[in-house]
Swiss-Prot record:
Its EC number is 6.3.2.6. Coiled coil: none annotated. One of its GO terms (biological process) is 'de novo' IMP biosynthetic process. The keyword Protein transport does not apply. InterPro entries: SAICAR_synt/ADE2_N (IPR028923), SAICAR_synt_PurC (IPR033934), SAICAR_synth (IPR001636), SAICAR_synthetase (IPR050089), SAICAR_synthetase_CS (IPR018236). This is Phosphoribosylaminoimidazole-succinocarboxamide synthase. It is an enzyme of class 6 (ligase). It comes from Streptococcus thermophilus (strain CNRZ 1066). PANTHER family: MULTIFUNCTIONAL PROTEIN ADE2, SI:DKEY-6E2.2. It catalyses: 5-amino-1-(5-phospho-D-ribosyl)imidazole-4-carboxylate + L-aspartate + ATP = (2S)-2-[5-amino-1-(5-phospho-beta-D-ribosyl)imidazole-4-carboxamido]succinate + ADP + phosphate + 2 H(+). Pathway: Purine metabolism; IMP biosynthesis via de novo pathway; 5-amino-1-(5-phospho-D-ribosyl)imidazole-4-carboxamide from 5-amino-1-(5-phospho-D-ribosyl)imidazole-4-carboxylate: step 1/2.
């Protein structure tokens, strides 16, 4: 049956469609932190995230990155290829910030000589623990070849994103990606890309991402609107 709720997430609800290989993602006006411990409804956030993520994924598709994105069909909805999500949060860091700075006792804002890729086990009950390649294999999440591909693809995506954000005066600090297996067993980029799952700083070091919500720095939607407007000006 179509339009049946498949999954309710922190920022999106997922529905079935008439095509068994296609799902509908509906973006919500909800901001969360501490793995959902703090929740707040922020009017307009869903529309902005859908627009930003759709724009980024369209550009990634055009650049030859295999993604789940098909098309945006309304202000808050988009169609995606159905995937089996790999239970990994793949984090790439260009600059020290957030939990990385806390974990290693270093100040925020230090450029990393080489971008660092980290894995976190997607498990709410365990609070998404930081894991390494050996843990990934032990948990039977991915094999050596798949791990290498995910890392390589994440680094390739990073180079594209860094260039695009640099063109609009924003510094890409870090971001989180999720991947999944499509119907043919191919690993493709899934989930979303928005200021919800990346850190962006402007030339003055102002936060242009969900840290505005996490750190009570002002209006989240005002910041997201600026990011969207800048992205819409990309050539």
């Amino acid at each position: 049956m179509s339009n049946q709720l498949i999954y309710t997430g922190k920022a999106k609800d997922i529905y079935s469609t008439e095509d068994e290989n296609v799902i509908k993602s509906v973006y919500k006006d909800q901001a969360t932190m501490l793995n959902g411990a703090r929740k707040e409804t922020i009017k307009g956030k869903g529309v902005l995230n859908n627009q930003i993520s759709s724009l980024i994924f369209e550009k990634l598709n055009a650049a030859g990155v295999a993604t789940h994105f098909i098309e945006r069909i309304s202000d808050t909805e988009q169609l995606n290829k159905k995937v089996t999500i790999i239970p990994l949060e793949v984090v790439l860091r260009n600059v020290t910030a957030g939990s990385f700075s806390k974990r290693f006792g270093v100040e925020e804002g230090l450029d990393l000589k080489t971008p660092i890729v980290e894995f976190y086990y997607k498990n709410d009950d365990l609070d998404d623990p930081f894991i390494n390649d050996e843990h990934v294999k032990f948990l039977d999440i991915a094999n050596d070849e798949q791990i290498a591909y995910i890392k390589e693809e994440t680094r390739r995506i990073n180079e594209l994103l860094k260039d695009w954000f640099e063109q609009i005066g924003l510094r890409l600090i870090d971001f989180k990606l999720e991947f999944g297996f499509d119907k043919d067993g191919k690993i493709i980029l899934a989930d979303e890309f928005s200021p919800d799952n990346c850190r962006l700083w402007d030339a003055e070091g102002h936060h242009m991402d969900k840290d505005v919500f996490r750190r009570d720095l002002g209006s989240l939607t005002d910041v997201y609107e600026v990011v969207l407007e800048k992205l819409q000006g990309l050539k």
